[in-house]
Amino acid sequence: MIPNDPAILLSFVNTKLRDFYSNLDDMCDDMELERKTIEDKLSLSGYKYSEERNQFI
């Protein structure tokens, strides 16, 4: 289960990406999450995934 609050979700996802995964697809596959769901939730708060930085900015 992932956090619903956008600020907590941002921190959760970026921490996972930094510490455990080389990209968002790997994280989603491993955690059985839908990439689109995460991107949609975070985009509502103005965040977008940067493949170059491997984080939402």
Positions of PLM-derived features:
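Short alpha-helical "recognition helix" segments of helix-turn-helix
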Residues: 27-28
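Short, charge-rich amphipathic interface segments used for partner binding and complex assembly
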Residues: 32-57
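N-terminal acidic leader/helix
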Residues: 1-23
